[in-house]
Amino acid sequence: MKLLPSVVLKLLLAAVLSALVTGESLEQLRRGLAAGTSNPDPSTGSTDQLLRLGGGRDRKVRDLQEADLDLLRVTLSSKPQALATPSKEEHGKRKKKGKGLGKKRDPCLRKYKDFCIHGECKYVKELRAPSCICHPGYHGERCHGLSLPVENRLYTYDHTTILAVVAVVLSSVCLLVIVGLLMFRYHRRGGYDVENEEKVKLGMTNSH
C-alpha cells in the first residue's frame, strides 16, 4: 500500500514531461514551417522551374504536331493526284519487270560463248543444245577441223596439157617469125649485092 502513492507520482511526472516535450516539438515544427514559407528552399524553386520548362516544351511539341497536321490536310486537299501517280508508276514498273521475265536470254551469248572455234553459235531449243555454223574451210561439231581442198586429177591433167599446147604454139610462132625475118633480110641483102655487081660491071665497061 505504501508503494502506490510513489508509483502514481512517477506516472504523473512522466506525463508532465511528455507533455512538455511534445509541446516543444510542436513549436519547433511550426517555426520551421513559417521559415520555409518566408524563405523557400532553392531546390524546390529549381524543381518548379523544371516543371515550367517541361510544360512549355510540351506545348511547343503540341503546336508543331498541330501545324504538321494542318500542312498534311492542305496538301491532301490541294493535290489529290500527286499521291495517285506513284501507284501508276509502280504499276508500270511491275509490268515492265513482268515482260522482262518472259524473255529468255540466248545461251550462246554467255554459257556457250566460246563453243564454236571457227564459226557462229546457234542454240537449238528443241534439242536444248548448241550447234555451230562453220566458216568456209572448217568442219566438225565445234568447227575445229580444217578441210583441205581435194584436187581433181582429170582437171589438173587437162589444165597442164592445155598449158603445154599453148606454150608449144607460142614457141613455134616465135620461131616462124624469126625465120621469116632472117629470110627476108637474106633476100634483101642478096638483091643489094647483085645491084652492086651490075654497077661495078657497068663502070668497068665505061672505062674501056
Swiss-Prot record:
Coiled coil residues, start to end: none
Transmembrane segments: 161-184
Transmembrane helix among keywords: yes
N-terminal signal peptide: 1-19
Name of the protein in its database record: Proheparin-binding EGF-like growth factor
Region feature (Disordered): 34-55, 81-104
Basic residues bias locations: 93-102
PANTHER family listed in its UniProt record: PROHEPARIN-BINDING EGF-LIKE GROWTH FACTOR, TRANSFORMING GROWTH FACTOR ALPHA
InterPro entries named among the record's database cross-references: EGF-like_dom (IPR000742)
Quaternary context: Interacts with EGFR and ERBB4. Interacts with FBLN1.
Extracellular side: 20-160
Residues the UniProt record annotates as site (Plays a critical role in diphtheria toxin binding and toxin sensitivity): E141
Glycosylation sites: T75, T85
GO BP terms, alphabetized: epidermal growth factor receptor signaling pathway; positive regulation of cell population proliferation
Name of the gene: HBEGF
